[in-house]
């Protein structure tokens, strides 16, 4: 799918979420889903009911405090970027941070936009040039955006 996206001139927007970068996170998440389903069944709860939802939310908070997720590291995010860059080339990769709605599942050093200098420093340390980093930060997305606007104007 990523190769097809690149072949068609698109850009994949890479997220920092442990869902995509950390095998351990995915394992923990799968285990949690089973425990949560069991909690709901044993307590005869319905996620659609507000009263039950508050009980489920309280369970989730307690569970996450007891068993915090391994959300990964900056290094794992950089490995994630490099894997895709090596797969399709830097011209087809961008930043799709996915900050909205993912609280608690991002690496400590990449929690919000103010953390971008950490990502940039990591890319520089791995030998990426400023020009390549500009492509990742916005250049590739803006290239595709321009192509979309040109297509829309001509049709």
Q: Whereabouts are the PLM-identified features?
A:
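Intrinsically disordered, low-complexity acidic Ser/Thr-rich regulatory segments
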Residues: 51-79, 83
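Mid-to-C-terminal alpha-helical segments outside catalytic/metal-binding sites
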Residues: 111-155
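Short acidic/histidine-rich active-site segments
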Residues: 13-19, 88-110
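Short, solvent-exposed loop/turn and secondary-structure capping segments
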Residues: 15, 23-25, 106, 146-149
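Outer-membrane beta-barrel pore domains
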Residues: 62-75, 101-110, 123-132
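Active/binding-pocket-proximal capping segment
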Residues: 29, 99-101, 112, 141
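Aromatic-lined glycan-binding groove of carbohydrate-active enzymes
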Residues: 1-59
């Amino acid at each position: 799918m990523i190769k097809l996206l690149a072949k068609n001139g698109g850009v994949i927007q890479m997220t920092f979420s442990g869902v995509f970068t950390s095998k351990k996170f995915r394992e923990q998440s799968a285990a949690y889903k089973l425990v949560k389903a069991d909690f709901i069944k044993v307590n005869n709860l319905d996620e659609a009911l507000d009263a039950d939802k508050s009980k489920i939310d309280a369970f989730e908070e307690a569970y996450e405090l007891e068993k915090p997720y391994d959300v990964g590291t900056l290094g794992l995010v950089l490995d994630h970027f490099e894997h895709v860059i090596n797969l399709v080339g830097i011209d087809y990769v961008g930043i799709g941070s996915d900050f909205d709605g993912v609280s608690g599942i991002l690496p400590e050093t990449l929690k919000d936009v103010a953390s971008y200098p950490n990502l940039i420093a990591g890319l520089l340390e791995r030998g990426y040039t400023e020009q390549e980093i500009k492509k990742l930060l916005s250049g590739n997305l803006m290239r595709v955006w321009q192509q979309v606007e040109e297509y829309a104007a001509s049709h």
